[in-house]
Amino acid sequence: MDYLKYGIEVVVKKSEKRKFKLIDYKNIDKNTFFYLCEAEFKGNPKNSRPDITLFINGIPVVIIEAKATLKIDSHLEGISQIRRYEKFSPDLFRFVQFAISYGEEQLYTPTMPNWYKENIHLPAYYWRIRQKINGKKVVKDDIFYILNPSILLEIIRYFIFYRKDEYSKTKTLSKIIARYNQYFATKKAMKRIDEYLSGDSKNKGLIWHWQGSGKTYTMFFIANYFLDKYFSENPVIFFVVDRVDLERQSKEFYEAIQEKKFKTILKRIDSINKLYEVIKSIKMSELSNKVIVRGIYTTTIQKFQYERSKKEKDNNKEKDKDDEDLDLSKPIEEIIKKIEDKLKKEEKEGKIKGLKDLLIILAFIYLKHLKEKNPEEYKKHIENLKKLKDKDKKEEYLINLGNIKRKHILILIDEAHRTQYGILGGMRKITFPNAITFGFTGTPVFKNEKNTFTEFSYPEKGEFYLDVYFIGDSIKDKFTLPLTYQIVKEGDIKSEGIQITLDEEDIKEFIDEWIKRGEDINLFDRKKLPKYINKSKTILLNPKRIDKVAKYIVDRIEEDTENFKFKAMVVAVNRLGCVRFKKALDKYLKEKFGDEAEKWAEVVMTYHHNEEEKEIIEYMKKLKKERNSNDFNEINQIIREEFLNSENPKILIVTDMLLTGFDAPRLKVMYLDKPLYGHRLLQAIARTNRPYPDKEFGLIVDSVGLFKVLTETMALYNMLAEEEIREDFKNNLISSIDEIFQEFKLKLEMVKESLKNLKINDEDLSIDVNTLKTLTKNKDFNNNELKEKLDLIAFYAEDGKNARILKLIDDLKAVIKLYKALGSYPQKIFYIEDIELLSFIYAYLIKKLKPKKKSNRKFWEELISFIHNKMLVDDLTVIEEINLNPDDLDKILKENIGKREIKRAVANYYFILKNSILDKQHDPIYKEILERLERLRRDWIMKRIDDKIYLNAIKNLMELKNNYDKKIKGKSSIERIKESISTYIGENILKDQDIKLNLENTEKLITKMQNLNKLSKLQRKKFKKELSCALLEDLLKELKGKIKDEDAKKVAELSDNLVSEFILKEIWGENYENQ
């Protein structure tokens, strides 16, 4: 493969080597492309004769195995034949990079020599292309796309690699080839990079690819393409993750890919000091062409620290001296001299306190460089610094001098929805302001202070993502599996399920009893009760209920996991819930399956050294004894590995850990007993969607009722794939980050000014934040004076009547909230010290004005236990049907809610209704609802109708769907077909008349068809024609005298359409034409 990519090095003289390229990748026309049919290649036990072999410059690079397109599963025969060729003629596959099987379906697969005639399992993929037809996105199969000469060369060069995992037990060699979604995402990323490096302003992008769609490989493809294309520019690449274990795993993952140039410069940045060294070396490369910093690094976002932790600061005995060296109130020339003298010592001792200080130091190094190389520029900067009286402004100026200006830096961020929005993200951006950044996620978030779209894309310009590959795409391509979602609840559908048999009087008696016992109890407000007696503690944590849920799981788990061929996960509400589930599951598993089943369920969760919960403490003791270890992190890791690689455990019990980033293909079933929302819910249920042999779907068993939340979450995500809706989202829900920053600065100055001029009853209570910032850096600073002033301010505000102080407190809260809303906006780092001080002032005042009463833990524990004992829990039952509720829309229509909420409802209810029937759209009634829904959407977008007319119409469509659902509920396939056609004819031909059609001939033909095995395409075509005739005959016979002559033509056209678009899809499935 390396020969094909990079050429062959040949010794032409004793000491001279020359590289001869086999393929010219830059000048495509200089290559010779041809093919041969049934070319024969030497093999053992017999020669190989692929149907078609494609050659570049006489080298075989692709083979095609062609099979009958009308024969069922013929493409799989082609794949098997290709695998035989690999065994018979391994030498051929030193050059052939991939193969195509062209049969009933068209697949491509990587190929490799099979010297030892083993059973090698290499994946086979569809190649699909995305097009826009009449404004709609259409995805269609096109296997020949990859055989276009320019595309083929690109795939060989950048999208095919060998992989050998040196950290695995087997160290098996395998081969990877890009899927179409990875290829197109890489191409879009490279286009963004090329345009930016050619002068365009856009230097970031969001790759929104669903869980299991190969994001890590996509990151590699982009990084390697960038490295190769801009190698002479000494590129630097960072793979950024948010956990130390992922930092190690990502380095091991990329090391396994056999790309020599890439692997040679791949390193892991495993400490903050190492990151500083890399940043400094990049800065030095900007000052000198002799310094080459080309490199690829894996690191965590947590290393981009503004300053060292408090503990590190406290341990620094020379803190005063360090701060003195960076005292910007001194002459700049004096500072530069001191920095030069101390820099080597500081670096050696690791005393640089954070990225802020590093960048300031790099600024002085840069100024020194200018002094020697460009005195005029140096003088200009010195004059500018002298003009700045404010220390913060000097720091900002210096940081912008010291940061990295290079553009050939690529930052690839995994799980971009998680930890990229605060100070760490801001420091990353201020350090590398000109870097190219791509974020990768399957579930973007869009809260005020955390918005993946604004962070990594340009929603204000209409770009919400660079590339999207969501759930539907992934399932269609079989990269992930569809999910089956079951809702279960206690009791049957009509019963309460859980009943609490106590009232307020019972609770009063309980409290009186406590007082009689002489126990100390604080008075509590009735409003505080929900904080202590909430759903989690009173219902989901109730031992009786957990016992019932555990028994229900054990009763059905054998069937759910197909006799434990697959595995299961239980998601408990919290850590105590995990321990209780473990105890209950062990009991019922042992009862049903015997003593060995006690090893089937294990807990993976966080353990605390200062644990207070008695049940958890007892479990920790038991676990340490069983595992013969005191290291709970190690125990968790062992259980995780056992779940992935051994028969036991068969069930994992979790609450937070492993709900994201845990790839376990054998996991099929999730018993969800914890309320999760938004992207966390999508991340969690996606644990079950990984393909595995014989696994047809992932199963979610929801015992907390999250289906509506899931539907709304999916609706909002799907909304962002609709161009017109994205435009509305942009206009109504996306605030400009620059506007927020300007608002923050104004508010901050106003608050600082208010504090500086604060006087009450002629008493000076002024607080100068700028002065305080300087004082707090002094090791001997005492904040008693500040606290005394704050005590007085709180005292004056105690009665709640001092409007000036109350407004000041509100303003403090508002400015802190605005700061958080800035996410990772780079300029926010220059206001960290302001916000730290204001946050302290605000928190101190609130603590004084609204002190928290000490809660009596024992009292609340006993009260909850008392409620548990008064609770009745029914057995669990599956609820099979989930109905849309038009009454919810009634409330929105009748209530006077804001414009923003109306806009959310417009989009949400559109997608809730659309998603509920999307997989049934072959049904003529559902299809009509979808068409009417789409017309409504376009009318609303074009402002032909207002919000309330739109929502009223949606409500009517919901009612139509619910009424129709009731008609067809519980009916056989044939009865559903007859009911659908009757309803459709009644509404569209007879104009809202009810009619019951018998369709005698149609029914006979369908019954006959259902009793036959698989038909050939020819037989299907014949049957389709017979069915159209039978349906037309039935309709004309039963509608005789009820329709006009001109309507008879409509009926004839309709019968053909109903057969091909509805009846056959109902019988044979959506894709019957391709089967």
Curated annotation (Swiss-Prot):
<comment type="similarity">
    <text>Belongs to the HsdR family.</text>
</comment>
<keyword id="KW-0255">Endonuclease</keyword>
<keyword id="KW-0547">Nucleotide-binding</keyword>
<dbReference type="Pfam" id="PF22679">
    <property type="entry name" value="T1R_D3-like"/>
</dbReference>
<comment type="function">
    <text>The restriction (R) subunit of a type I restriction enzyme that recognizes 5'-CAAN(7)TGG-3' and cleaves a random distance away. The R subunit is required for both endonuclease and ATPase activities but not for modification. After locating a non-methylated recognition site, the enzyme complex serves as a molecular motor that translocates DNA in an ATP-dependent manner until a collision occurs that triggers cleavage.</text>
</comment>
<protein>
    <recommendedName>
        <fullName>Putative type I restriction enzyme MjaVIIP endonuclease subunit</fullName>
        <ecNumber>3.1.21.3</ecNumber>
    </recommendedName>
</protein>
<dbReference type="Pfam" id="PF04313">
    <property type="entry name" value="HSDR_N"/>
</dbReference>
<dbReference type="GO" id="GO:0009035">
    <property type="term" value="F:type I site-specific deoxyribonuclease activity"/>
</dbReference>
<keyword id="KW-0238">DNA-binding</keyword>
<dbReference type="Pfam" id="PF18766">
    <property type="entry name" value="SWI2_SNF2"/>
</dbReference>
<dbReference type="InterPro" id="IPR055180">
    <property type="entry name" value="HsdR_RecA-like_helicase_dom_2"/>
</dbReference>
<dbReference type="InterPro" id="IPR004473">
    <property type="entry name" value="Restrct_endonuc_typeI_HsdR"/>
</dbReference>
<dbReference type="GO" id="GO:0003677">
    <property type="term" value="F:DNA binding"/>
</dbReference>
<dbReference type="InterPro" id="IPR007409">
    <property type="entry name" value="Restrct_endonuc_type1_HsdR_N"/>
</dbReference>
<dbReference type="InterPro" id="IPR027417">
    <property type="entry name" value="P-loop_NTPase"/>
</dbReference>
<keyword id="KW-0540">Nuclease</keyword>
<dbReference type="InterPro" id="IPR051268">
    <property type="entry name" value="Type-I_R_enzyme_R_subunit"/>
</dbReference>
<dbReference type="InterPro" id="IPR014001">
    <property type="entry name" value="Helicase_ATP-bd"/>
</dbReference>
<keyword id="KW-0347">Helicase</keyword>
<dbReference type="InterPro" id="IPR040980">
    <property type="entry name" value="SWI2_SNF2"/>
</dbReference>
<keyword id="KW-0680">Restriction system</keyword>
<comment type="subunit">
    <text>The type I restriction/modification system is composed of three polypeptides R, M and S.</text>
</comment>
<dbReference type="GO" id="GO:0009307">
    <property type="term" value="P:DNA restriction-modification system"/>
</dbReference>
<keyword id="KW-0378">Hydrolase</keyword>
<keyword id="KW-0067">ATP-binding</keyword>
<dbReference type="GO" id="GO:0004386">
    <property type="term" value="F:helicase activity"/>
</dbReference>
<dbReference type="GO" id="GO:0005524">
    <property type="term" value="F:ATP binding"/>
</dbReference>
